[in-house]
């Protein structure tokens, strides 16, 4: 029989019609001789009623065999329910079954197919095809499909060209670890799976495509966390002849369209802009969450003359004020915050509370001489808690930024209904890597430096600024972009600043440098993490919830057991040997 419609879409207007439905048995109940079945498909659940007085003995016998997750086909008459169920979209109607066929049986599932099921993440991933049957998971992927549909329509309307770039590319430095693919034909050589289509999309601009986009898989072999996976999807854009502002306008329009069509939210345009320095100094993060206050306060000058060397001799002293919540934090609670602070390089955490109009706490006695000035600067009031970090500016910012976010979550200070977008601009071109002992690209080595700072490529690299911009949503980096280098001489200077010899630069990027000899236009672009964007729109805490078949925290798949061993024959074809490092 041909299915008439989805079970979850049957409504009162269908009363009096005969329809055919197909789906899974979500629940079976026997009551007063009647059998009630909740039939589930991707659109929802509908109640079926099987009355032994109105169906054949064969239908009744089949109904009595039904168990959870059996796949069935039913035909019946749509009726109004005697008692409506306002928890279901189909709660005003039910189907009086006249015909029933079991299409497939099912074993008892390892967990119940319902929302808010309590089961380990690895069990969910081991049986991902069952986990994806849960209504909230289905809704996440419907949302994801709507987002990608909206993005494609928007970019198509703006005459962007959708172009597929290679999955087998060249391994290049200056990024995360590559996933490598050995070549059978060129033995001893390897492809890399792309961390992004960065260079190829720039070459498309040199080819005259003018506006490119792609919703593309990318791969990075890095440590995992809640908003990272080894393979991920990004919305990749590149344009020719547009300014930084023009590119941002296009992206803002795209996001506004997605928010309207998927969440029915009108976002205010243009998005706020914040410099990198303001973000770090006021929020302690290059991806600030602006849904709440608790800004970092610089007290370095204020405490300079006090008789407390931890403060007076520190390169930087900064603080955050937890307004009106000092009584929520015991000494034990603050000790936990101190241990948390040490994870970010801080040596400790100093604190005072405002109690009966005065400062109280371990360091209060050292602040007596500046108490009035301090109270005024921090706008202190009764029951405030002040947390101080005295260290380098970088450690103070990073530590207090992390504390700010943790405390806001702990105290439920964040309005979860808000979607606060902003641009972080005016980035440094380089960042110092303690591990590498050198400066590395803050974004990538193809970013265009500002005209005012480009001369420092041969001087103080810390002073070079980039024409780069990150888009941030609620404390998450949604994506980043920049104007790109299109002049060969500038690109060679950039490689040299990063420590490449001329031969090394030519070996790694010679094809790009050669392309710059052939009229490379000014260009720029951006990439947005689609998984992360959908995660935030779905109000989930982990991108695994919006990726159909993700990896676990060990970058493995409990369902397929990937990664797996391969045969000796396969290794021999690739001229590879596995060495043990026990």
UniProtKB/Swiss-Prot annotation:
The lineage of its organism: Bacteria, Bacillati, Bacillota, Bacilli, Lactobacillales. Gene3D superfamilies: Bira Bifunctional Protein, Domain 2, GAD-like domain, Nucleic acid-binding proteins. Its EC number is 6.1.1.12. One of its GO terms (cellular component) is cytoplasm. Coiled coil: none annotated. One of its GO terms (biological process) is aspartyl-tRNA aminoacylation. ATP binds at residues 220-222, 229, 477, 529-532. PANTHER family: ASPARTATE--TRNA LIGASE, MITOCHONDRIAL, ASPARTYL/LYSYL-TRNA SYNTHETASE. It comes from Streptococcus pyogenes serotype M6 (strain ATCC BAA-946 / MGAS10394). InterPro entries: Aa-tRNA-synt_II, aa-tRNA-synth_II, aa-tRNA-synth_II/BPL/LPL, Asp-tRNA-ligase_1, Asp-tRNA-ligase_1_N, Asp/Asn-tRNA-synth_IIb, AspRS_core, GAD-like_sf. Catalyzes the attachment of L-aspartate to tRNA(Asp) in a two-step reaction: L-aspartate is first activated by ATP to form Asp-AMP and then transferred to the acceptor end of tRNA(Asp). This is Aspartate--tRNA ligase. Its main location: cytoplasm. It is found in: Cytoplasm.
């Amino acid at each position: 029989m041909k299915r008439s419609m989805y079970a979850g879409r049957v409504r009162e207007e269908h009363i009096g019609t005969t329809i055919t439905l197909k789906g899974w048995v979500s629940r079976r109940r026997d009551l007063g001789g009647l059998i009630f079945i909740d039939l589930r498909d991707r659109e929802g659940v509908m109640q079926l009623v099987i009355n032994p007085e109105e169906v054949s003995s064969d239908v009744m016998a089949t109904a009595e065999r039904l168990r959870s997750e059996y796949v069935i086909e039913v035909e019946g008459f749509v009726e109004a329910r005697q008692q409506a169920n306002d928890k279901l979209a189909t709660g005003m109607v039910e189907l009086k079954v006249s015909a029933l066929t079991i299409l497939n049986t099912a074993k008892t599932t390892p967990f119940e197919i319902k929302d808010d099921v309590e089961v380990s993440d690895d069990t969910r991933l081991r049986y991902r095809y069952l986990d994806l049957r849960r209504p909230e998971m289905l809704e996440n992927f419907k949302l994801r499909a709507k987002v990608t549909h909206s993005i494609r329509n928007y970019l198509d309307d703006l005459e962007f060209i959708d172009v597929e770039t290679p999955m087998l590319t060249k391994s290049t430095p200056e990024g995360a670890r590559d996933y490598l693919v050995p070549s059978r034909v060129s033995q001893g050589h390897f492809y890399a799976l792309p961390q992004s289509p960065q260079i190829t999309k720039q070459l498309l601009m040199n080819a005259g495509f003018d506006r490119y986009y792609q919703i593309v898989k990318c791969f990075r072999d890095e440590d995992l966390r809640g908003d990272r996976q080894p393979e991920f999807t990004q919305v990749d854009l590149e344009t020719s002849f547009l300014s930084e502002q023009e590119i941002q306008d296009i992206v803002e329009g795209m996001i506004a369209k997605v928010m309207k069509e998927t969440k029915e939210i009108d976002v205010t345009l243009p998005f706020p802009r914040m410099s990198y320095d303001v973000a770090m100094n006021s929020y302690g993060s290059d991806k600030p969450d602006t849904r709440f206050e608790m800004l970092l306060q610089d007290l370095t000058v204020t405490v300079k003359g006090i008789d407390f060397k931890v403060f007076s001799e520190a390169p930087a002293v900064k603080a955050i004020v937890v307004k009106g919540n000092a009584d929520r934090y015991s000494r034990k609670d603050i000790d936990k915050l101190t241990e948390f602070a040490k994870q970010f390089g801080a040596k400790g955490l100093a604190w005072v509370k405002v109690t009966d109009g005065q400062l109280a706490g371990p360091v209060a006695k050292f602040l007596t001489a500046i108490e009035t000035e301090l109270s005024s600067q921090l706008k202190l009031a009764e029951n405030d808690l002040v947390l101080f970090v005295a260290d380098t500016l970088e450690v103070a910012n990073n530590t207090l930024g992390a504390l700010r976010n943790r405390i806001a979550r702990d105290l439920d200070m964040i309005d979860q209904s808000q979607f606060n977008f902003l641009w972080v601009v005016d980035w440094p071109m380089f960042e110092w890597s303690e591990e590498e002992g050198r400066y590395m690209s803050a974004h990538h080595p193809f970013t265009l430096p500002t005209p005012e700072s480009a001369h420092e490529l041969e001087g103080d690299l810390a002073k070079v600024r980039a024409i780069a911009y990150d888009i941030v949503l609620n404390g998450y980096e949604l994506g980043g972009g920049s104007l790109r280098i299109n002049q060969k001489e500038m690109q060679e200077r950039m490689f040299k600043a990063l420590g490449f010899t001329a031969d090394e630069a030519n070996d790694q990027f010679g094809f790009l440098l050669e392309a710059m000899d052939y009229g490379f236009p000014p260009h720029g672009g951006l990439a947005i993490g689609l998984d992360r964007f959908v995660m935030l729109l779905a109000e989930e805490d982990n991108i695994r919830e919006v990726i159909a078949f993700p990896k676990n925290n060990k970058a493995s798949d409990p369902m397929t057991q990937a990664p797996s061993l391969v045969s000796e024959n396969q290794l021999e074809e690739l001229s590879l040997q596995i060495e043990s490092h026990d």
